[in-house]
């Protein structure tokens, strides 16, 4: 395909929406304002696509996610733009690839106000807009030039502490998502359509270690991905993660019940997904499947035929155009995403649009995890069953530097959230039989990685240097560069420093005394000296723990 701009090669899908109208389904563009649907966008934090009961995961129960999927459409191939919270969410809100958003391309940075977001557009067209939990985050809203979170007006005042019944004490976010949603609904005027963003903090780390076992889960039911060592501690850690997914599902159920009680369920376009993959080594903050492949279920009363599975490759940049089209609002030309209405309005399962066989993902700076906060830029193209990853700076550590001092949390490899599974993989460094797990997660990678997704579901067999796949690699790389160039990737313009110079507002480890950037900047010299000493003490504590982990592995 010589021209792979998604805006160009996906325009043909609009004709499929017309076909849906001919079959008796109302096209969103023909809607009158008074018939505009409500929009409920539910997004979890760090949930990989395979972990739901409808996908066959025996160790987790997600009846409410399954309910949405069965009532509507399950998307088998949905991808985030970036496997990192803030840039993934920015791409959803703006309908653009993260690399198009300048400072919005990174974690703990900014999201410039010049970029339009769909909640603001809908609000201008009469929608009641708000969010609870985690909206666009983490980053600095004020320095972005915004007066509020781009997800809408905040509804986080109502708190809850029912966790003891769930088996934890204080590891979960204490916002009552459903109660705040109800408060949001009470604020709207009459039958005003609403657009609400429900962002759960779960299943983001940290977890209450052993939660899954305390809830009666059996470690034997866990399917340990091949890129992780199969140890009791890893199995227990995965159970804890799955338990938090169940907590998310419970909150989803409460919100669905609220809609049903108010008679709004059938007039609400409901989307359930996650921002990026599970917080484990070689998953989150990576462009492999477990980092970018997301759960996605969408239902909309009787407007769409339910019980279907769609194979089209879709990207999070497609959400904003979908919501705007559903509301009968013109989609801004600068949005790179394409509406999912043809897929939703179709009566069929499987591949709806044959041209939706390609998608793109990226990574820039995730955590402060290399000297000076340097990024580990990556770009990828998934086309049909092949995934090509381009590591633009292969000399840099892909998961953060191995030296703890250079990382935000003063642990090695700071792009990987710390927890039991990370410690288990760190311990593999000195075990000859298990060293592969360490290398897969942390070691430097070649410039190109090529994987056959169907034959290699965990992306462990790099085909990039295999002569048999040379033409495949070259074709994919050509398509990738064409798309990056057409969509204004600053790396293709020699301006990658824009992504790297953005302030990192979280702690920069020793550089900010273990404090968040603005907090550190407000200290006097004496206070900074104390912060530096506290950070050095924390570093020593981490180094001692790291020594214990590695020594135990050597024995």
Could you describe each region identified by the protein language model?
Residues 493-506:
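Short, charged, surface-exposed hinge/linker loops at domain edges
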């Amino acid at each position: 395909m010589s021209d792979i701009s998604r805006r160009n090669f996906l325009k043909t899908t609009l004709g499929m929406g017309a076909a849906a109208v001919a079959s008796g389904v109302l096209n969103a563009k023909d809607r009158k304002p008074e018939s505009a649907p409500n929009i409920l966008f539910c997004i979890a934090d760090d949930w990989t696509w395979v972990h739901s009961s409808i996908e066959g995961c025996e160790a987790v129960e997600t009846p409410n996610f399954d309910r949405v999927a069965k009532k509507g459409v399950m998307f088998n191939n949905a991808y985030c733009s970036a496997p990192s919270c803030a840039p993934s969410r920015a791409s959803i809100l703006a309908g653009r690839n993260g690399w198009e958003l300048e400072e919005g391309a990174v974690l703990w940075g900014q999201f410039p106000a010049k970029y339009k977001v769909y909640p603001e557009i809908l609000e201008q067209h009469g929608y009641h807009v708000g969010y609870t939990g985690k909206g666009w985050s983490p980053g600095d809203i004020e320095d972005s030039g915004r007066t509020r979170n781009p997800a809408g007006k905040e509804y986080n005042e109502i708190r809850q502490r029912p966790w003891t019944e769930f088996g934890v004490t204080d590891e979960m976010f204490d916002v009552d998502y459903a109660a705040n949603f109800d408060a949001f609904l009470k604020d709207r005027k009459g039958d005003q359509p609403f657009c609400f963003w429900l962002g759960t903090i779960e299943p983001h780390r940290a977890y209450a270690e052993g939660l899954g076992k305390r809830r009666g889960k059996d470690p034997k039911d866990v399917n340990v991905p091949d890129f992780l060592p199969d140890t009791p501690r890893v199995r227990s850690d995965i159970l804890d993660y799955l338990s938090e997914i169940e907590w998310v599902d419970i909150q989803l159920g409460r919100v669905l019940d609220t809609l049903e009680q108010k008679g709004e369920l059938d007039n609400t376009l409901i989307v359930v997904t996650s921002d990026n993959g599970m917080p484990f080594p070689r998953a989150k903050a990576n462009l492999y499947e477990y980092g970018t492949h997301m759960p996605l279920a969408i239902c909309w009363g009787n407007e769409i035929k339910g019980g279907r599975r769609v194979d089209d490759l879709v990207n999070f940049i497609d959400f904003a155009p979908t919501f705007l089209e559903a509301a009968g609002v013109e989609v801004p030309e600068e949005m790179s995403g394409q509406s999912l209405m043809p897929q939703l309005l179709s009566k069929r399962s499987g591949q709806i649009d044959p041209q939706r066989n390609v998608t793109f993902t990226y990574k820039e700076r995730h955590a402060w995890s290399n000297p000076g906060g340097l990024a580990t830029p990556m770009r990828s193209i998934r086309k049909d069953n092949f995934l090509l990853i381009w590591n633009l700076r292969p000399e840099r550590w892909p998961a953060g530097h191995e030296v703890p001092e250079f990382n935000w949390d003063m642990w090695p490899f700071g792009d990987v959230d710390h927890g039991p599974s990370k410690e288990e993989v760190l311990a593999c460094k000195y075990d000859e039989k298990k060293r592969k797990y360490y290398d897969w997660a942390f070691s430097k990678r070649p410039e190109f990685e090529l994987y056959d997704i169907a034959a290699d579901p965990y992306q462990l067999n790099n085909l990039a240097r295999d002569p048999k796949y040379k033409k495949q690699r070259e074709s994919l790389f050509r398509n990738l560069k064409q798309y990056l160039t057409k969509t204004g990737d600053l790396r293709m313009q020699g301006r990658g420093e824009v992504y790297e110079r953005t302030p990192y507002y979280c702690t920069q480890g020793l550089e900010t005394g273990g404090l968040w950037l603005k907090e550190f900047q407000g200290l006097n010299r004496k206070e900074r000296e104390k912060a530096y000493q506290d950070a050095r003490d924390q570093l020593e504590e981490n180094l001692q723990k790291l020594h214990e982990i590695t020594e135990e592995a050597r024995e």
